[in-house]
């Protein structure tokens, strides 16, 4: 792709680094921004800078937050004895949009994947185990994607907390194998949470 301006070329190259954005789409976005008032582009740039510099991760659940503790964990109305274990922040957003879950979350930051070189030590697993050991947790709900990596991660965590006297469940398999939670429709995802099943049944029946 040829550019008549090095500035445009640099902007397109940076924009195309975003997931799902190719060079042609990046060019359309850059040209759109070029047509906008300078202050509008400034607002966008400042918003992105503020997000990158000031965003925090909740010290309790690892969700994104503007403060040390996220709004969900700080909400005394939520059920703090039930923890929904998810892969990343997009899953928190997807589940929250269902309006069916009233507990809190624990964001792992990924899933175990030997192929990609991701092991348990690179995920937020130890802090979850510590929460269970504290004796304040009644139920853990696994809500990872139905993939080999997701199932491996679930089973690894299960082995770490199996001896504790808590309920360990997983969302019902209303979501197709291999699907990510963020792409599930709200009704299906909401039902899968409400109709969650004991985790032991998922591997004893296999």
Curated annotation (Swiss-Prot):
The keyword Protein biosynthesis does not apply. Gene3D superfamilies: 3.30.60.80, 3.40.1360.10, 6.10.250.240, RecR Domain 1. SMART domains: TOPRIM. Residues 81-176 form the Toprim domain. Keywords: DNA damage, DNA recombination, DNA repair, Metal-binding, Zinc, Zinc-finger. A zinc finger (C4-type) spans 58-73. GO terms for molecular function: DNA binding; zinc ion binding. One of its GO terms (biological process) is DNA repair. InterPro entries: DNA_Rcmb_RecR (IPR000093), Rcmb_RecR (IPR023627), Rcmb_RecR_Znf (IPR015967), TOPRIM_dom (IPR006171), TOPRIM_RecR (IPR034137). May play a role in DNA repair. It seems to be involved in an RecBC-independent recombinational process of DNA repair. It may act with RecF and RecO. Belongs to the RecR family. This is Recombination protein RecR. It comes from Flavobacterium johnsoniae (strain ATCC 17061 / DSM 2064 / JCM 8514 / BCRC 14874 / CCUG 350202 / NBRC 14942 / NCIMB 11054 / UW101) (Cytophaga johnsonae).
